[in-house]
Amino acid sequence: AFALRWMRRDRGSLDFDLPDADLVLGEKGDVVAIVKEVRNEAHRLIEEFMLAANEAVARHLLFVPSPAMYRVHDRPDERKLNDLRAVLEPLGYDIPEDDELVGPTVFQKIIDQAEGKPEERFVSDLVLRAQKKALYAAECRGHYALAAKYYAHFTSPIRRYPDLVVHRALCEWIASGRPPAAAEAESRERWLVDASAQCSERERRAESAEREAQSWKKFVFLSKKVGEEFEAYVSAVVSFGLFITLEGVYADGLLPMDALEDDYYRYEDVEHRLVGASTGRVYRLGDHLRVKLT
């Protein structure tokens, strides 16, 4: 796993090894604890084998050739890169001005630079949000974040339909030993265009439902913690206050402007910060705070 991972890193692959929150459920389905997700070398070993298999199958089907459904990930757009520069450069993280020079290695360097620092999680979250959403497509356009020319989802056919589509294409080639006839290939390509779009849309809906369910479970759990204090960091600065993320729980909330009672704060949108009129105290993205849940 270590060798495979470093082979990917050498070619420019981007690794988001972000810890997440695991919801521990009781017998009645209620959340009894929120703990940090455990990721060890066994998880990484399986992940590397899955990535290697996905790449190998995508490459094979492309060069057979046999129509298939690919997993594609495009470059970040200009607006998101500019937003990322505006936030990270004042913190000492450099992003080339020429967007064409911003490859996944640039983002990996930023993540590595932030490792072990107070803003590590915040910086990784920002870099992740700057990326485009990966999609399914009938054409192989490569995977930007993985620095892979060929990529498909192949390893989970029992729970993900695109993987089943890829399995069927591979099994058909193994059985026949030749690519499909031109007319059949053209018909399948047309079907894959529509199927890929639907799979991408269904994936977005499923992820949205999952996030909503987790947020609700966290809300119910935290409603019993009102009055307790938590470590948090600033995830967004707006004209009416600070959006914060509770560390360890990874739940988001708002610290409204009127809760900052020590001064009158003005919002500076270019620098994405709040500045105290009398004290000069500054609240900016990534700042760590201790907050009380109300």
Label each PLM-derived region with a short phrase.
Residues L254-T294:
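Intrinsically disordered, low-complexity linker and terminal regions at domain boundaries
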Residues A1-E261, G286, K292:
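Electropositive polyanion-binding surfaces
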